[in-house]
Structure formats: C-alpha cells, structure tokens
C-alpha cells in the first residue's frame, strides 16, 4: 500500500470534524488521531467510530505518544495554537494552523503554496481570505492593483462564538492578506453575518482598482484560470457572473474598477452546504497538507 503522511487533528469541533471527512478521502494523508478537551464532543465520538485514536487530554497527550504524527492540523483557538506551536516544532511535527494565530507564513494555495512547502508551520488566514484573495492575486499578476476591497457575506448561523469574538481580527488579517499575498498596494476587508433564514451560502464581492488602459481580456482570463484552480479543491467555488469592468468615476475615487462576484457552496461532508465559508477553510487546509505530504514523501523516497 502506498505510504501516507500520518496526521493528527487537534480540536474536535465543527471545523475539525468536517476536516476529518476530507482527510479520510485523501490519497496522501492518513488521519490517525483526533485530540480534544471535551470528552462528550461529537467530533471525538465520530472519529473513534471511524477508527481514529482519540483523547480529550489535549496536545500534551499526543506529544507523549511513542508514535507521532508527521502533520498536525489545528483548529482550536489562536492562544491554544500559539502555546502548542513551539511544542510541535521541538517534536519535528509540521503544523497547518486553521486559527488566527499566524505563527507561520499565511498560505493561499493558488498564490503562494509552492513558496512555503518547507515551512514548519503555515497559517490558513481566514475563510474570507481563502475565498477572495485568489481573485485579487489573479488581477495583480496582470496589472498593478493600487487598492482592493473584499466583502464576505456568510450565513449568521455558520459563525460560531469564536468568529463573532474575532471580527476585528478577521478583517485585519484578511486585509493584510489582500496586500501581502493578493498583491494590492492597499487592502480592506468587510464581513457580513447574514441572518437570512433559510441560510444563504457564502457570497463574496471583490473590488480591484486597475489602470484605465488595463488589458481587460487578460484580467478576465486570469480570474477564470484562478477560479478553475480553486475548484480543484473546492468544487462549490464559482463565479456568479463575468467580471464587471467600470470606468473611473467619483464613486470609485477616480479609478477604473474590476468587480468579481463569487459564491462558495460547501461539500456537505459534516457542515451544511450553506457553510461554504467553513468548508473552504477545511478544503484549502487539506490541499496544503497534501502538497506538503507529496513533497515530503516523494523527495524522501517513500513513494
């Protein structure tokens, strides 16, 4: 049987459980452990039924095991990951961080994954970042983008207490990613918790300022190419319509604009399909883990 990277999931909540189902389908990753702190959590119960070794005794239990993971996916909280990250590093365990801790470099698969395959710890930014930064990157690789603004609208019921408590952190982290990874000179991020019932799937609007003489066909083609790339790991990611180009106006600060509308429908592995905002995080994290495993196993001669 082909070799797979041994994986531990730290956290046993909604995101961790959805991630588990994606990892179970992977040709490169083998989930072996799920670590939580709540012995009654549904995530631990499901993981145990699926054959994983589970514990509610936290990260220290995992690190005390004689057989250790190659990779850890952590979906706890920023402060928990900041405490655990040095322990993973000391044990030689690579970490994929789904919290806002940002201990390691931020990764958006279509934009900069190849640059960070050797990093001991990588951060998945935010759901809004995973959904919108690829579009900013698609535009900025064709023309200069002096300003980009993203608006992420997610179903209110999909936003848990952690998201609600960290709205400011969400916007700052996403805006920073729009600049550092997306390539915009300045960036802004807005999140809307949509209270509609039945819940609406995630929808995002991405505004990019562009030169008035920009090659619009090249920009549109680049956007379509990046959307196709994201769809390889998030099939429910799609354009709502063609990118819209607007001439400079007072409303746009005198700059030409390209506006892109996308929506993200989840795969429904554990979370409902409307929770595309959470699904894109687990799918992107799985993609990153698989690419790290491919690099490690192929270069190391395990395959």
UniProtKB/Swiss-Prot annotation:
Signal peptide (from-to): none
EC number assigned by the record: 1.2.1.87, 1.2.1.10
Pfam families per UniProt: AcetDehyd-dimer (PF09290), Semialdhyde_dh (PF01118)
Keyword Nucleus on entry: no
Record-annotated active site: 127 (acyl-thioester intermediate)
Family stated for the protein in its record: Belongs to the acetaldehyde dehydrogenase family.
Name this protein carries in UniProt: Propanal dehydrogenase (CoA-propanoylating)
Organism: Mycobacterium tuberculosis (strain ATCC 25618 / H37Rv)
């Amino acid at each position: 049987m082909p070799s797979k990277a041994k994986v531990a999931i730290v956290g046993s909540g909604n995101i961790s459980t959805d991630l588990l189902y994606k990892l179970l389908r992977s040709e490169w990753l083998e989930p072996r452990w799920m670590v939580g702190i709540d012995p009654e959590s549904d995530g631990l119960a499901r993981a145990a039924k699926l054959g994983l070794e589970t514990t509610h005794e936290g990260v220290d239990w995992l690190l005390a095991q004689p057989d250790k993971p190659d990779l850890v996916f952590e979906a706890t909280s920023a402060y928990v990951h900041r405490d655990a990250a040095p322990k993973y590093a000391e044990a030689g365990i690579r970490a994929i961080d789904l919290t806002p801790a940002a201990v390691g470099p931020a990764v958006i698969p279509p934009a900069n994954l190849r640059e960070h395959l050797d990093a001991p710890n990588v951060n998945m930014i935010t759901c809004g970042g995973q959904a919108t930064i690829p579009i900013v990157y698609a535009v900025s690789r064709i023309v200069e983008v002096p300003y980009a603004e993203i608006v992420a609208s997610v179903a209110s019921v999909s936003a848990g207490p952690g998201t609600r408590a960290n709205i400011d952190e969400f916007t700052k982290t996403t805006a920073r990613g729009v600049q550092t990874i997306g390539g915009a000179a300045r960036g802004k991020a807005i999140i809307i918790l949509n209270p509609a019932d039945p819940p609406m799937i995630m929808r995002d609007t991405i505004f990019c300022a562009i030169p008035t003489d920009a090659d619009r066909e090249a920009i549109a083609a680049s956007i379509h190419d990046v959307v196709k790339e994201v769809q390889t790991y998030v099939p429910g990611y799609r354009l709502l319509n063609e990118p819209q180009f607007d001439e400079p106006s007072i409303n746009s600060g005198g700059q030409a604009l390209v506006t892109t509308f996308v929506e993200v429908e989840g795969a429904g592995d554990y979370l409902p399909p409307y929770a595309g905002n959470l699904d894109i995080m687990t799918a992107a994290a799985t993609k990153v883990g698989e690419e790290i495993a491919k690099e490690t196993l192929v270069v190391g001669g395990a395959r």
